[in-house]
Amino acid sequence: MASLVAQANVELPEIDWFALSPVLVLIGTAVAMLVVAGLTRPWARGMYALVTVVGACTAGALAMVLWVEVSNDGPRTIVNGSLALDHLALWGTITICVAIVLAALVTEDYLRRESMDGPEVYALYLSAAVGGVVMLAANDLVVTFLGLETLSLSLYVLASSHRRRAESTESGFKYFILGGFASAFFLYGIALVYGTTGSTNISDVAGVLDAEVLLQGDDVMLLAGVGLLLVGLAFKVAAVPFHFWAPDVYQGAPTPVTAFMASAGKAAAFLAMLRVLVVALPSLADDWRPVIWVLAVASLVLGSILAVVQTDVKRMLAYSSISHAGFILVGVEAAGHVGRVNDGTASSALYLLFYAVLVIGTFGVVTLVTRTGDGATDIGAFRGLASERPLLALGLTVFLVAQAGVPLTSGFIAKFGVIEAAVDVESYAIAIIAMVSAVVAAYLYLRIMVSMWLTGTEEGDTEREPVRVPLSAGIAIAAAAAFTLVFGIFPGWLIEASEQVAALAR
C-alpha cells in the first residue's frame, strides 16, 4: 500500500493521533462492545452500561489533558486542516461525554425493565457521540456534514429502538424523514458556499470573505448558501420554525434516548453553529445576526407558551427545550457582534453544559415515574410522588427550579450569562424578551412541582406500579442534582474555563 501511494505521488497528511484520542476511544469502545458481545455469552447485568461509562470517562479525561495542552500551546488545526483542536472542540467533547455517562446510567435499568437488554443502544450512544464530536470540531463544512449525518443516523435508530411501542417506531420514522430534508438543505448550502468561495474549509472561506474578492452576484448565492446552512442547523437544535419534529419525537422515543438527544445532540449542533458563524462567516455577521435574532425570539416565545398548555410531561419538556434553544440563540446572536465574540460564545458553551446535566437529570426522574411501558407520561403520573419517593421528588424539584432560572442553581448562572452577553452588546430587546419568557416558563415547572408536593394520590392510583429507584439511575440523578447545586453556588471555576472557549482555531 505504501509503495502504491508513493508511485501515485499522494502526500498523506500527518496525523496527531493523541489529538484524536477522545474520538478513537469512543469508536473503539463501541466496536469492541459489539464484537465481544456478539462472540460471547450475554454479559452480566449492567456490564454494557459500565463499559460505556468507562469509555466515556476515558474520552473525557483525555479531552481534559488536551485542554491543558491547548492552553499551553494554543489552538490549531489537525488532519490537514479538516479538524480543529481548540477549547471549543474540547468543551463540546467533555459535555458530550458527561451526557453519555449520565444517559447510560439512566438507561441501564430502563432496558432491563422494557426487556431490551443488549449492547445496541449503548453502541449507538457512542457512535452518536463520535458524530457529535466530529461535527463540532470540524474545520471543513464537508466534515461538519459527515459528523452531522453520523450523529443523526444514530439518533434516528435510537428514537425507534423500542420496537414493541408503535410510538417509538413512529417517532424514529418521522425524525428520519424530516431530518433527511434538513440534511439536504445543509448539503445544498455547502455546495453554494463552495461555488462562491471555491473552498469548503472554514478557515479558507473566512479568508476569501475577508479579502472581498467575490465576483458580482456571488454575494446573493453566498447568502443563499448561508441561509440553507442555518436551516439545517436550526432543525437540529429545534429552533422555531424548524421545531415541529421535536414534541412528537421526544414523546415517542424511549425516555433515556430523549434525554441524550436533548443534551448531546443539541450541544453538538449549537457548537457547530458557533464555529461556522463565528470562524467562517464573521464578515457576514450583519446578515446572519438578524436571522439568529428572529429564531431566538420565536423560540423563546412559542416554546414557553406552548409548553405551558401541555398535559404530557415529555411534550412539556420538548417545548421547554425549544425555549432553552432560544436562550442559547441569544448567546449566539451576541457572539455576532464585532469585538464581543467572547461573551456570546462563552455564555452559550456554559449554558450547553449546564443544560445537558439538567435535562438528563429531569428525564431520568421521568424515566422512573413512567414505569413499565414508558407510557404514563401525563402530569397526573406525578401526583403524590413526594409522599411515595420524597428524595426523587426533591431531585426533580432541583432540576425544575434550575430550568426556571432560580438563583443558587446552575440554570440561573446559564440564563444570567446569555442575558448579560445580550445586554453587553446592547441587544436590550432580546434580553427583555428572554427574561419575560423565563417567567412564563416558570409556570410550567411550577405545575409539575404542585402535582408532586401538593396533590395527593387519587382513587385508583394505589393500584399503579410503584416507583422503583435502581442504583444506577439513582447515582445519575444524585450526581446531576449535586452538579446543579454546587456549580450554581460556586460557578467561578467553570465560568473561567468557558471564557477560554472563544479562542478558536482558525
Residue ranges with predicted function:
Residues 1-506:
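Alpha-helical transmembrane segments of multi-pass membrane proteins predominantly involved
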